[in-house]
Amino acid sequence: MIPLLCFTLAFGAILQAAAQECTDPNWEVIAAGLTNPRNLHFGPDGSLYVAEAGIGGDLEPTCEPADNMFQPYRGGYSGRISRVLPDGTLQTVADGLPGFLDGFGDSLGVSDIAWIEGTMYALIEGGGCTRGLPDDPAGVVRINPDGSYSYVADITAFIRANPVASEPLCGPFGDCEPDGVPHSMMVHGGKLVVVETNHNSVLEIDPASGSVTRMLDLSVQDPAPIILGRKGNDLFLAGFDGLIQMFGTSFGSVSTFDQDYSAIVNLHIRGNDMYVLETFAPEMPWTPDTGRVIHRSFDGSRNAIACGLNFPIGMARRGNELFVSVTSYGQGPVTGLGQIVRVRL
């Protein structure tokens, strides 16, 4: 168990990715001053929005702390959602969002954003009483026009009431997170599909009713799922173990699509092109400035199109450009070090 942003992931051996060696970094910085930036998306207005996890605060747990290797936790309200203006300036859309800092200096907070019929929703990865945030659980919030937020789904309560088949390991070598670690989400059929990493789950959220349903329980396999992508009626689930799995939109049987990547943190699919974001190189785990973007054609070929990225997490596409959030973790309780870079395809 290794502390990536306190992702609380179960990570096995690093496998050498069968991709062409990258010789051209192929990226440029277009925005700076972000604090632990996570997922990013283009909104209905065409602007680029990014979730920033923040650096937690000084709030101590209000219930029994999580029994894992990442203690102690300190919660706070330093998370933010920013709009990136064309000149690279950051405009705050919402701030004061909940999150926490762990004993390794990594943070979990707001991790993703999505829109349904023009309404913005944000995913809170780092809430709950074990993080000093009893009134702000891990879950989905609606971002109101004035920048305030309102909860629409309590993922912490669902995780606590509905254990998976194989619960995460607790103890000094464990990574259990009783309040949950919902890391990413996508819109599907008017609902939000959330990837919860610590309990190896895919959840469906109805923002109208607040209901939470577990669509997949992969806990016995333990792939540490991170991100979902979609191509037609097929969904692709990429994990930190370097595996990409696929299943239909009915969430039926799961099969292996591809494997032997390094630690996957994002996935983008358009047409016959899949772009896989690795947060570090396979031969240099946990090494700064080694993240890569791999182009994976549906004919099976792979090609590294960008490299030298510093601990990336988020990735979005517009036209023939990818936008990637970098310096997204591993910086301790320091603000403003995160950036967004542009990769030309």
Report residues per predicted region.
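Beta-propeller fold detector
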Residues: 28-29, 91-96, 149-158, 213-217, ...
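Residue position within the beta-strands of beta-propeller blades
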Residues: 49-52, 122-123, 194, 237-238, ...
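Residue-level signature of beta-propeller blades and closely related beta-rich strand-turn architectures
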Residues: 54, 126-128, 198, 241, ...
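Short, solvent-exposed loop/turn segments at conserved positions within beta-propeller repeat blades
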Residues: 59-77, 130-136, 197-198, 283-290, ...
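A short loop-to-beta-strand structural motif that recurs across blades of beta-propeller domains
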Residues: 77-82, 138-141, 201-204, 242-245, ...
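Short loop/turn segments that connect beta-strands within beta-propeller blades
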Residues: 85-89, 143-147, 206-210, 248-252, ...
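Blade-level signature of beta-propeller repeat domains, shared across WD40, Kelch, NHL, RCC1
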Residues: 316-345
